[in-house]
């Protein structure tokens, strides 16, 4: 590891349609091989599908989904005296949203619908209603942290 100062956080421009940095990050996570226009088309088409099918505000649905899937605790592996312990730690907001978007995208891609637009639309709608595979992933992460609560005194970061 380098001993120099930590790399600066890059400034991400908000997306054109909703002027949201969170949505812009989500689009960047959807993107493969630098095809940002295709990623934007997938996300905005999924938003249109949510609006037509469920008659709700798609941007509000997206925000609810991200908020519902965002974890508050996770486990990190800490080596103490030759043994590895899974220590529960708090997740900061930026990492929480990064995990949430990754989990939603992975859950959507594993769905049975034919097109990614349909998969993403359904997963976002389910996550906004506290259902779906992404929500289960969050609950499993919290259960793991709760099960390893006894090792929280090994925490590398102070738990608040």
Curated annotation (Swiss-Prot):
Q: Which UniProt keywords apply?
A: Ribonucleoprotein, Ribosomal protein, RNA-binding, rRNA-binding, tRNA-binding
Q: Which GO terms describe its biological process?
A: translation
A GO cellular component term found in this entry reads:
small ribosomal subunit
Q: Is Ribosomal protein given among the entry's keywords?
A: yes
Q: Which residues lie in coiled coils?
A: none
Its transmembrane ranges are: none
User: What InterPro entries has UniProt attached to this entry?
Assistant: Ribosomal_uS7, Ribosomal_uS7_bac/org-type, Ribosomal_uS7_CS, Ribosomal_uS7_dom, Ribosomal_uS7_dom_sf
The record's annotation in CDD domains points to:
uS7_Bacteria (cd14869)
PROSITE patterns per record? RIBOSOMAL_S7
Drop me one GO molecular function for this one. structural constituent of ribosome
How the protein assembles, per its UniProt entry?
Part of the 30S ribosomal subunit. Contacts proteins S9 and S11.
Cited function: One of the primary rRNA binding proteins, it binds directly to 16S rRNA where it nucleates assembly of the head domain of the 30S subunit. Is located at the subunit interface close to the decoding center, probably blocks exit of the E-site tRNA.
Q: Which family does it belong to?
A: Belongs to the universal ribosomal protein uS7 family.
Its name, as the record gives it, is Small ribosomal subunit protein uS7
Taxonomy, top ranks, is: Bacteria, Pseudomonadati, Pseudomonadota, Alphaproteobacteria, Rickettsiales
Query: What gene codes for this chain?
Result: rpsG
